[in-house]
Amino acid sequence: MEATQFQTMLEERGILLSSRALAQFERYYELLVEWNEKMNLTAITDKPGVYVKHFFDSVSPAFYYDFSAPLALCDVGSGAGFPSLPLKICFPHLRVSIVDSLQKRIRFLEHLITELGLADVALYHERAETFARQKGMRESFDVVTARAVARMPVLVELCLPLVKMGGTFIAMKAASALEELKEGNKAISVLGGEVTATETFTLPFDEGERTIIFIQKMRKTPNQYPRKPGTPNKQPIQ
């Protein structure tokens, strides 16, 4: 997939990219490959692969969810900025917060957002378990996203505490997600969420199946969650 194909395929989904946005995606690709030589950001470095498996995949929640409002979005464990920064490029009015536990990735993201000229992007070098307990962060985001971070019972404990009442947690998963979702049902309920939709689609050029799970925050998350760092992984709610 080249940039023009990417633009056309997003247009078919109702997402129109400006010339500035196209240039930002091009620069994003260049910086990703450049910095990947110094640190492990991605195993995918060929241009068609990055455009399909990172950029197109990251924007895919917008095929099913309305990002046209000035939403506050938190991306947990975004790595090289996925999915939040491709979404930010497409929807510049989003207010984005990125939480990642590795300082070297934060350094890359700092450079990236400066180079791309992205405003209203805040970076936090934190564990999600700690970040979600901070006053002003807990239950304060309209949308929380996570892409390939952890299995559902763990992921829900890291992310749902950050979602405001009535807001949405968007979990981006591979093809096996529906089986995984069953494992996470108890955690979703305990943490105050309710699954409102699951959407499955195939990436362009048959590059793999993806499932996006939308969970709405219906009740406040009990104060004991998230538990201390490492506990959700070792003892998931099941």
Curated annotation (Swiss-Prot):
Binding site for S-adenosyl-L-methionine: 77, 82, 128-129, 147
SUPFAM superfamilies: S-adenosyl-L-methionine-dependent methyltransferases
GO CC aspect terms: cytosol
EC number(s) reported in the record: 2.1.1.-
Gene Ontology molecular function: any one: rRNA (guanine-N7-)-methyltransferase activity
Keyword flag Repressor: no
Coiled coil residues, start to end: none
Cellular compartments annotated: Cytoplasm
Alphabetically ordered keywords of this record: Cytoplasm, Methyltransferase, rRNA processing, S-adenosyl-L-methionine, Transferase
Taxonomic superkingdom: Bacteria
Function field: Specifically methylates the N7 position of guanine in position 535 of 16S rRNA.
Family membership: Belongs to the methyltransferase superfamily. RNA methyltransferase RsmG family.
NCBIfam families reported in the protein's UniProt record: rsmG_gidB
Official protein name in the record: Ribosomal RNA small subunit methyltransferase G
